[in-house]
């Protein structure tokens, strides 16, 4: 990578010697060896994205089995034991094997490009973190291969359900140690991200010129270092209980509540660990398709810092009904965390306001995220109130809220990010028509599945039950939810077809920025980038270096306006001094 220089755009990559060589078909064995031994952050990012998406499909299939079971009263296709394993592993897979490593995938791919770094700070540690995640997750899911099946005590493993008496199978032990393994990978990855952002920014890339996505990766990394060691310690203590009779989480000495405190001190920051990076993705996409810089850049960063700080003060709102927590404090802090989240909404809507909007597929997914996450946030404010929470705790109202928040953030923003950065990943654009078909089928299927679950919960249907009576009156809404869930599941098919069609027939991108209005630094290098990302780096004078590079006439006007404002302020100061 050269020192600062005025780049030649996409032609710089085309002029390189590598691009003059004849294109050869890679041997499958060479590809496998490359993936097994790589330390390139882009390849590792791709591995994270592919693996996490595979777990997304596996977790989704489990969800469809559960919805098929609940379509009608009576046991249809699963026993109670199988249903317990399904909801335990569905939650575990979606949160810790899909959403968390998906953040690592996007961060690995995009963050070094956005700060002008040639790679991450510790490439081999990066590779090690991925393999810890993969093998840890495989160990946890491997419980399905054991005689008594996988873990069946719910994904938050409440004591005493998770002790050796109530869950004697080896599936529980595999779940505990697999998640500890995988968690170490997440911790090591976050150390890498934080070090890279602090130490490896390009010349001119000050902290307050960093893209919002990079800021969110930094704060997410800090949250991981606060939350995941607590989970690892709690998991080892639980395994000591199960194997060595340590009696740490015995109900007789308050251990059941101790587990809840330890788990939720991890669990609530975890929700923001999987939310903040995807907020960052949306914050990158909306300005590009609004043809405007982000509204309130500093305020958006401040709101993100506030969310990260407050996220470690609200864990016991999961424990209102235990009677063992200070309700006024945790209720107030939970209401309070809605404020910076609301600030973010004003930033996003303010960016779109009076912008030159165009609804290409990434923008469509981002708009779907705004609508869905807003619904989830509103039901979160309801659950923050202890009297209302007492009524709907452990009901389908909580299930609906959680899916609106997590699915609405992670999955909608994931597809937005895929469609937005696919040219950067592969050098080809995903098909717009197929992308819109995927969006509308998923959007309708999702809301049909989970909107009605709010009413089911308010009417009293408990979560995690495999069966209900016809006399309960839950049948109609459950049937609607199940039909919609299969529409939601089918929405993945056009996306897979889109990937295949693009790979086989898509045209090669010849420019650095195929969207035309990209602002951050990844749009100032070729699609896909060279091994160390940049052949030349543009000068970084603002938080939109790629836009300044490709639209110098607009950046020149902005600089003149800034100089004019500065001169007026200076003159005003002199007058005040007189």
UniProtKB/Swiss-Prot annotation:
Similarity comment: family membership: Belongs to the heme-copper respiratory oxidase family.
Binding-site list for Cu cation: 268, 272, 317-318
Gene: ctaD1
Note accompanying the cofactor annotation: Binds 1 copper B ion per subunit.
Pfam family name, one: COX1
Compartments, record wording: Cell membrane
PANTHER family recorded: CYTOCHROME C OXIDASE SUBUNIT 1
Catalyzed chemical reaction(s): 4 Fe(II)-[cytochrome c] + O2 + 8 H(+)(in) = 4 Fe(III)-[cytochrome c] + 2 H2O + 4 H(+)(out)
Keyword Transcription regulation: no
Positions that bind heme a3: 401
One of the GO biological process terms: oxidative phosphorylation
SUPFAM superfamilies reported in the protein's UniProt record: Cytochrome c oxidase subunit I-like
Cofactor(s), names only, from the UniProt record: Cu(2+); heme
Membrane topology according to the record: Multi-pass membrane protein
Oligomer status and interactors: Associates with subunits II, III and IV to form cytochrome c oxidase.
Keyword Zinc applies: no
Pathway note: Energy metabolism; oxidative phosphorylation
PROSITE patterns according to UniProt: COX1, COX1_CUB
Disulfide linkage: none
Assigned keywords, A-Z: Cell membrane, Copper, Electron transport, Heme, Iron, Membrane, Metal-binding, Respiratory chain, Translocase, Transmembrane, Transmembrane helix, Transport
Organism: Streptomyces coelicolor (strain ATCC BAA-471 / A3(2) / M145)
Sequence positions that bind Fe(II)-heme a: 90, 403
Listed transmembrane segments: 44-64, 93-113, 125-145, 174-194, 217-237, 262-282, 294-314, 319-339, 363-383, 402-422, 437-457, 480-500
Role this protein plays: Cytochrome c oxidase is the component of the respiratory chain that catalyzes the reduction of oxygen to water. Subunits 1-3 form the functional core of the enzyme complex. CO I is the catalytic subunit of the enzyme. Electrons originating in cytochrome c are transferred via the copper A center of subunit 2 and heme A of subunit 1 to the bimetallic center formed by heme A3 and copper B.
Enzyme Commission number(s) of this protein: 7.1.1.9
Designated name of the protein: Probable cytochrome c oxidase subunit 1-alpha
A molecular function (GO) term: cytochrome-c oxidase activity
Main location: membrane
